[in-house]
């Protein structure tokens, strides 16, 4: 390009002796010929002179070269840029001149009408980044006595038609969908695909497979599993979404709450020494029971994490927050204060907030990252026993969906993944399956939410040090003891319960009860299934040398195996009762199921290792425990003249088992002694009341009063009741502790109970006579004082679903020590509340305590 491409005609120096204001004559030279190098421009005056009449610009034609083109040269010094060819200097007027200006007007008027081209600074001024007056030669070049060469504008890029790329992608996707439609139409025309055959249809050679092709699709942030038909077009669809999608929101705040702009991760991050301690606690107490973290890989980040969170990637930061949270969960309040100097509840709140906000900021719902799912699984485990169990189970469904999105339900070998990733995916998937099964039971469901349609194999018996990240061949499984033993045992037991297809919950409720009939089970089939499981577990333990002497993890796994087999073997179906036999009623069976649930928490105590006590605490449900204690106030030891001695003996055994579990619960959960918590205070009063009745019953039978257990004495001292063994409760309670009967709670006319299922009249509130100042409910029931009544209709849900909240509520309604302390709310059942500890939003009806602040409003309690 020429050095004067953007210089006005009046300011251009003369070239080859020609007058600068006169255009060159057309030479008719070949346009493809090389142009001669331009001579050095002669100095001209910096003062621009008005152009003369002869300096009027001329119109360039194909036979006449434009300005800047040397005679005899076909190539312009402007390089024939499209923008330059379309410059007003080279274009003829597109319309006749107007009447107010003559056609041959003054050139200065034509210059004003034309848009002046942009004049760039010279090359020297651009390189030095100094101001250029854009008059060539410029002042700077003249002072430096160097040639002043104007700069060349950047060439314009060739623009593609608008949305051409999007149209091409849409055309490709449309063509593929058309091809699929034609194949489907052909299949329908041949009679296949219209009806579902009774036998599997023969495979066809069509490229369209109804089962899809499982694959991992690479995308930003990780990989995504897809096995549907649209997976074949995912790449094209993904590029199209990238062109048109402008919404970055993934909805994470809908689950974990909105982001807090003022939150600083450093404010919740522990000190460097505490980071090492928390990680060590996690690997000692949590990791042996939840082998979802590869320890050698994580240890490479510990040193970096000790210096602060900002050098870590968001997924690693979320993982460390969850590890810190689980480490605090595994400690009790005294251990937390002694080892770390933390207040346990405050540490739980800080680390939980750090984990939640990290999840929200990284948009964890839209990420396809295994580390993020590991962190989220640990976070959900930490919520067990600290938040609403129903909300936790709902959140666990989110984790399972994320796992399916990552393809964890398909074995990694089938997907061609490396051995280490394959093994860690197996561990994480089976941990989610076990967690879902446990949480579903606590939430009141008989079966887990996850569907048994996965192909993920059970994890191998391997130590973390056996798995190297760079391994290419499959790992060789160990035959000796490893830390995986407890996880493998729980995976095996859960898989048995999910695949057996039997209602073992119903079997266990009815087992050992006189006249109990195991619902929907066959004696021979049940016996064969349990024997087969016992053989499999025996072979399993023999192969991996399961023995308590191999360490605390093996001791816990050994107790778990014995407990599991014992319960299943004892849960054999019983013959139906005869006409003169009296079996257990629904309340008795619900009471037994609640005791069995508490016996599961006894499991860790059998190991006598405090490091694993947390595993029972996280699944402890205080409302289920309250239900057992409340029932102990109703159960009375049968007399020697009881007609149905077999039933009486079974009930006595249940009472003894319940009191043994109460002792274990107070040993496992020292927080229950904190009577500043209103719920724990009411439980403590109920325990004292139940023990008082048991003590009196044993006194009548044996003539001696049994000594009070240590936890009863401690509760009596805390509550100021020092006469527990003398039969006095300090005058604090005068009610009989009986539950209301159907007669007491009988609805009046028009309530709809007789003709329907409306139980609104059975839900006491401020208007039902249970609030402060309301009339008390009579404690003498229609069946007589001291006689246990049949449960009202609304208690049917306790037996069908064993929802601890329902069982608790059913035994609190009425003046039995809880009815005068709680009021059923006059508000929708799906009231949303925020837990101060976890910050989660969950649903559930709260209870209202009496007005303790004197403001006329009842105090609100958590459900």
From Swiss-Prot:
Pfam families xrefs: Fungal_trans, Zn_clus
KO phenotype (gene knockout): Increases azole susceptibility. Reduces the transcriptional response by cdr4 to ketoconazole stress and increased cellular ketoconazole accumulation under ketoconazole stress. Decreases the ergosterol production but accumulates lanosterol.
Biased composition (Polar residues): 67-84, 97-113
DNA bind region: 122-148
Upregulating conditions: Expression is induced by ketoconazole treatment.
Subcellular location(s) per record: Nucleus
Coiled coil regions in record: 163-190
Keyword terms, alphabetized: Coiled coil, DNA-binding, Metal-binding, Nucleus, Transcription, Transcription regulation, Zinc
Low complexity bias spans: 43-66, 195-205, 764-775
A GO MF label: zinc ion binding
Region (Disordered): 1-115, 189-214, 744-775
GO biological process, alphabetically ordered: DNA-templated transcription
Assigned GO CC terms: nucleus
Domain of life: Eukaryota
Function field: Transcription factor involved in azole responses. Positively regulates the expression of azole efflux pump cdr4. Also regulates the transcriptional response of the azole target gene erg11 to ketoconazole.
Protein name per UniProt: Transcription factor ads-1
Species for this entry: Neurospora crassa (strain ATCC 24698 / 74-OR23-1A / CBS 708.71 / DSM 1257 / FGSC 987)
